[in-house]
């Protein structure tokens, strides 16, 4: 068998066969070396592989160095007014303030329910330097006020016209011993005596009496009768109705 002529086919045909049937190279005659083939075409990219396992935790980083504070910024524009908040709890009472100025007079009030329709009042004086008669009635001969005429300066007696509670009082000047008695319908109610220790003295006394219509009240003296009524040494007898029945 002549190898030199049978192992040299045409180059074009051999190249085609080599590309189509590369495995057949192993079946070629061991004594015959073929021409190296052309590089193949690039294959398509493969798929992404699976994620790898989580790696170990790294070492702590180097602490950062704080930076320097920047310059202060400019003041911003005022914001919109906020909504009104809820009322807070009531605070403690403050201290009283100073009194305010006096206000104008108010309107007249309504008439009260109680109105005293009946009145009785008098004040009379005894204007004389002569002593009254011993053991007798004392007349007060000058009226300061006696609008109802309930005290009679001629008789020296007060006559009750309006039943009720009355108050009687006397202030008498004296230049000698004096005992002043208040009588109600000839019955002695009070007696005030004063013994002289100076040239002139004053004696006083008062009493509340409930009177009925027609009752009479007057003043009298006993044998101590040093009552006077002069300028600077007045003797006064007064009475008035407190509460009518």
From Swiss-Prot:
Q: How is it modified after translation?
A: O-linked glycans consist of Glc-Gal disaccharides bound to the oxygen atom of post-translationally added hydroxyl groups.
Q: Which GO terms describe its cellular component?
A: collagen trimer; complement component C1q complex; extracellular region; extrinsic component of postsynaptic membrane; extrinsic component of presynaptic membrane; glutamatergic synapse; postsynapse; synapse
What Pfam families does this protein's entry cite?
C1q (PF00386), Collagen (PF01391)
Q: 4-hydroxyproline-modified residues are where?
A: 36, 39, 42, 45, 63, 81, 96, 99, 105
Residues annotated as signal peptide: 1-28
Main location as per UniProt: secreted
> From which domain of life does this come?
Eukaryota
Query: Segment Disordered: which positions?
Result: 42-119
Output the PROSITE patterns linked to this UniProt entry: C1Q (PS50871)
Compartments, record wording: Secreted; Cell surface
Domain characteristics, as noted in the entry: The C1q domain is the ligand-recognition domain, which specifically recognizes and binds the Fc regions of IgG or IgM immunoglobulins.
Q: How does it assemble?
A: Core component of the complement C1 complex, a calcium-dependent complex composed of 1 molecule of the C1Q subcomplex, 2 molecules of C1R and 2 molecules of C1S. The C1Q subcomplex is composed 18 subunits: 3 chains of C1QA, C1QB, and C1QC trimerize to form 6 collagen-like triple helices connected to six globular ligand-recognition modules (C1q domain).
| Role, per record | Core component of the complement C1 complex, a multiprotein complex that initiates the classical pathway of the complement system, a cascade of proteins that leads to phagocytosis and breakdown of pathogens and signaling that strengthens the adaptive immune system.
Q: What is this protein called?
A: Complement C1q subcomponent subunit C
Q: Which organism is this entry from? A: Rattus norvegicus (Rat)
């Amino acid at each position: 068998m002549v190898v030199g002529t049978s192992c040299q086919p045409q180059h074009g045909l051999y190249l085609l066969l080599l590309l189509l049937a590369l495995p057949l190279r192993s079946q070629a005659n061991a004594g015959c070396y073929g021409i190296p083939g052309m590089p193949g075409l690039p294959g398509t990219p493969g798929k992404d592989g699976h994620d790898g396992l989580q790696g170990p935790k790294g070492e702590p980083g180097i602490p950062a160095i704080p930076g320097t504070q920047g310059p202060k910024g400019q003041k911003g524009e005022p914001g919109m007014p906020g909504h009104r908040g809820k009322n807070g709890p009531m605070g403690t009472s403050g201290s009283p303030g100073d009194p305010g100025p006096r206000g104008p007079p108010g309107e007249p009030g309504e008439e009260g329910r109680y109105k005293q329709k009946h009145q009785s009042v008098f004040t009379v004086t005894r204007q004389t330097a002569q002593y009254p008669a011993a053991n007798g009635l004392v007349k007060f001969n000058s009226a300061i006020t006696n609008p109802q005429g309930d005290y009679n300066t001629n008789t020296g007696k007060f006559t009750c016209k309006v039943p009720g509670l009355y108050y009687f009082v006397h202030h008498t000047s004296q230049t000698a011993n004096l005992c002043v008695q208040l009588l109600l319908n000839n019955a002695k109610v009070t007696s005030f005596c004063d013994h002289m220790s100076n040239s002139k003295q004053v004696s006083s006394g008062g009493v509340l009496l409930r009177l009925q219509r027609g009752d009479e009240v007057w003043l009298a003296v006993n044998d101590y009768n040093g009552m006077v009524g002069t300028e600077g040494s007045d003797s006064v007898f007064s009475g008035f109705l407190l509460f009518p029945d």
